[in-house]
Amino acid sequence: KIVLRVSKKTKTQFTSIIEVGGELRSNQGVAFPDSSLSLATLTDKDKNDIEFGNQLDVDFVAVSFVRDADDILNVKKLINPNTMVIAKIELKSAVKNLKSIIQESDGVMVARGDLGVQLPLERIPIIQKEILNESNLLGKITITATEMLTSMISSYRPTRAEVSDITNAILDGTDSVMLSAETSIGDNPILSVQAMANICEEVDETSNKNYLNKKDISVSNELTNSLSKAAVQVANDSNAKAIVAFTETGRTPLLLSNHRPDAPIFTFTTIDKTYNQLNLLWGVEQVKINRLETTDEMFSIANKWLK
């Protein structure tokens, strides 16, 4: 972490004073927390990368340094129709325009590393809760990322504070938690994944799973959401062992997941991309099947698979 303060500038260069020194590695990002830059969110390289991703038919496109909803809409114009857009909330302007950004996105990433540079550190936990709460209310996928198990870059076990951090993110309603440096440059990538998985499983098994059921999830399709909410209520009241959903787009399991049922959600789909995208949803286990023609076939394959 290096901190510079600009002391003099011209149109093409600047002179700075090193306030906090350190090792400067290649390909590192530069943040300007006290400035509003007029740079385009999408560069020519970004557009070329998106085109390459379209050729591969990628499942997700994560958009860095989103400022407003227009940034998301501009990306949607370029990607394949069924590719999901994940907005990375990293800037002050993104926090200011949070609701409109979430509304236009398929999912949101709480990018705490860059947020911690742009905003005072003491505000980050509250902002994280606001992002997750607003995303859950709008029925969007959520990812919490950055510095979750930083100590495990060099240590074989996490700190107590890191365990609490991951636990609170799950209790706040995140669908997914993500590792970064721990697995990309760390000494213990496998141990890091195992530690995070163990924490997630423990929270899911022992916590009050109804902590999100009290929220009124206000997604656009009110009928589908009402049916999903009713299905979860019936499943909870009857102590059902599983909830089964058949889907092509992934919308139904997303809504079911947002209501945090006690039972796991088994989702059957014929679409490869939907199968992959369902990996990010809380409490969902997906099954790839061939196309079925009747509801009798659906009941048959569900019963056969669940046994």
Q: Where do the PLM segments sit?
A:
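Non-catalytic helical/linker scaffolds that mediate oligomerization, partner binding
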Residues: 1-307
